[in-house]
Structure formats: structure tokens, C-alpha cells
Amino acid sequence: MNDKIAIIGAGSWGTAVACSLGKNGHRVVLWSHTAGVADSINTEHINVKYLPKHKLPKTVSASTDMEEVCKDASFIFLASPSLYLTSAVEELLKFAPFSHDDGEMPYPTIAVLTKGFIPDENGEPQFIIDVLEKMLPDFYKNHLVYVAGPSHGEEVAEGKLTGLIAASQNPMCSIRCREILRSRSLLVYSSLDIIGVQVCAAAKNVVAVAFGVLDALTVTSDIFGDNTESLLLAAGLNEIQTIGRAMGATHPETFTSISGVGDLDVTCRSKYGRNRRFGNEIITKKILLSFENLDDLIKNIDKIGYLPEGVVACKYLNILAEKRNLKLPICSGLYKILNKELKPLDLIENLLQGDTK
């Protein structure tokens, strides 16, 4: 397969997808915003910063030059974190074919791997796909693909059996993405429910942070255990469905699919989960002491050393809950913890006793 595939974002997930595609015979070029990461991929065939334990195929290379990465690519995956995604796309738009919106040049298919929301001018969460459709040439209206599912990058790179959903309002685009991604170890299913899949992908990270808090509290309290975790998981799924309905999701089966309960389960329970880790470290490392409030935490989130997307999503979902009068006890309670208005133990006890105030 000689078609070039570009991946914008050389974090653990973008690199893992590149690894899988490379093993499947594709030529892949990663865009990294740091030269050190690109150099390690090109010289050692390892992403030393974000995926250091996994050797990459020689068909995978990297560059900090956006034009070089995207030139002649037939397929582009966007994998930058939600905080930085629009900046990366603005850079992408400077180069052909995106710099010539004449409808004549062939446009590559674009799929989004990023999980999260992008706020509007009022701070309410917007779907990533909606924001990108406004930024990209008109051709991409209803033609973007959103990819999600229970898929930690470490296991995808190891070739462990994984399932993903490729959602698009254009069935042919989702099918093309499915055919490019799937392999013996990567099962990919098509979906038309691009709204529901995006809600699940973003909101489950908030639940996972709360799950990490509970995980840490089980060590210091004898009233929490495996049963408690399942109780929180079920409450989290219910909350995600509430968010989905408020944001226009119309396919309830999405929430019980691999992109719904499947992704929620692995994000909460897996040892690889950054959101669970962050929630745990709120208790075990008193990590919030280094920040004044939630806004300060988001502004200086690089200081943590890893990116828990649930922290950012929590802020936007709390705004959504307040403006639309939604009962989101996990999101709203976690917001108060991150903003230093509530003690972690109080949140968990309130949730598990059915107090949604």
C-alpha cells in the first residue's frame, strides 16, 4: 500500500495508531510539535516521550514540518489534544490543498482521534466535528470521521485485540476509515451516530477522574470496594446518557456499544488510564495543592506531566449543566473538587448515597 497517511499529533494515541497502520503496510508520517520526539521516531523508531516501550515499523516517520507531513497524503488523522487541536488545524490550513478552497483539488479524507470538547464563546462545550467543519473547506461538511472506542494506545501498539467505532454522517467516509484502520488485531465498525460517539468519548473521561478518586479512597476507607466501583460506573453511564440527550444524541444504542459502556469501562478500570491516574493522585499526591483553582489547573496542565482530558471536559460540562438545568452529580461534584469547593470524600459519599445536590 503506497498511499501516504498523515497523523497530526505524536502523543501516545497518535503514535499507537501510526504503529498499527505501519504494521499493516501503510506509509505513515507523524507531525510532532517537538523536534526531540520526531528525531527519536526517525532515528530510533521509538517515541521516547509518549510510547517508549514500543518499536515502530520503519514505514513510520515523523517531522515538525506540517507541510512536509501533509503533502500528498490521501488520509489525515487528527490526534492533537483538544486544548491544542484548533491551533494544529490552523497550521494545517496554510498548506495545499486546504489553502485553495476552489473545490477542484482532491481533498484527503480526515478522521478525528481526539477526545474532548472545544468551548464556544460562552464556555459551553462544542463537538470537535462541528468546530472543524467551520474551519475546514466546505467539502468537509458531513464528510469528517470520528474514531473512538475502548483503546489504550499501549495495547493497540502491542497488537492486542481492540475494537473501534468510525462514525460519520457520510457512510462512505466511515467505511474508508474502517478499511484503512482495521487489521487482525484492530476491529473497526461503522456508525452514523457521530453525536453520540463524541459525547461518550469526551464525557467518560470525567467519570474516570471520579473513579480514580474512589480508587484511592478504597485504600484508606473500609466502606468502598469492587461493588462501589460498579455503582459509580453505572451512575457514570447514566450521566453520559443525560449529556447525550441534552446535546442531541438520538441513537440510544450507542451508549451500550463499545464506544459507550465499553470505552467508559476501560477508561475507568485500566492501569493505563491518565484520567483515573489523575483522580487517584488528587488523593495520594495532593496534586491540586499546586494549583489555585480549576482555571489555573487547565492553564498550567503541562506541569502535571501528562494530560487528563477529563479535567478540561469537566469544566465545560459543568457550564452545560448550569445553563440547561441538568442533573450531572458526577460532573458538577468533580468540578467543585477541582475548583477546591468540595472535599473528595464528600463527593463520593454524596454520590453513592443518592445526593445529587
UniProtKB/Swiss-Prot annotation:
Pathway: Membrane lipid metabolism; glycerophospholipid metabolism. Its EC number is 1.1.1.94. NADPH binds at residues 12-13, 33, 115, 153, 274, 307, 309. Coiled coil: none annotated. It catalyses: sn-glycerol 3-phosphate + NAD(+) = dihydroxyacetone phosphate + NADH + H(+); sn-glycerol 3-phosphate + NADP(+) = dihydroxyacetone phosphate + NADPH + H(+). Keywords: Cytoplasm, Lipid biosynthesis, Lipid metabolism, NAD, NADP, Nucleotide-binding, Oxidoreductase, Phospholipid biosynthesis, Phospholipid metabolism. SUPFAM superfamilies: 6-phosphogluconate dehydrogenase C-terminal domain-like, NAD(P)-binding Rossmann-fold domains. Its main location: cytoplasm. The active site is at 204 (proton acceptor). Transmembrane segments: none annotated. Pfam families: NAD_Gly3P_dh_C (PF07479), NAD_Gly3P_dh_N (PF01210). It comes from the Bacteria. Sn-glycerol 3-phosphate binds at residues 115, 149, 151, 204, 263, 274-275. GO terms for biological process: carbohydrate metabolic process; glycerol-3-phosphate biosynthetic process; glycerol-3-phosphate catabolic process; glycerophospholipid metabolic process; phospholipid biosynthetic process. It is found in: Cytoplasm. GO terms for cellular component: cytosol. GO terms for molecular function: glycerol-3-phosphate dehydrogenase [NAD(P)+] activity; NAD binding. The keyword S-adenosyl-L-methionine does not apply. Catalyzes the reduction of the glycolytic intermediate dihydroxyacetone phosphate (DHAP) to sn-glycerol 3-phosphate (G3P), the key precursor for phospholipid synthesis. NCBIfam families: PRK00094.1-2, PRK00094.1-4, PRK00094.2-3. Belongs to the NAD-dependent glycerol-3-phosphate dehydrogenase family. HAMAP family: NAD_Glyc3P_dehydrog (MF_00394). PANTHER family: GLYCEROL-3-PHOSPHATE DEHYDROGENASE (PTHR11728), GLYCEROL-3-PHOSPHATE DEHYDROGENASE [NAD(+)] 2, CHLOROPLASTIC (PTHR11728:SF1). This is Glycerol-3-phosphate dehydrogenase [NAD(P)+]. The lineage of its organism: Bacteria, Pseudomonadati, Spirochaetota, Spirochaetia, Spirochaetales. The gene is gpsA.
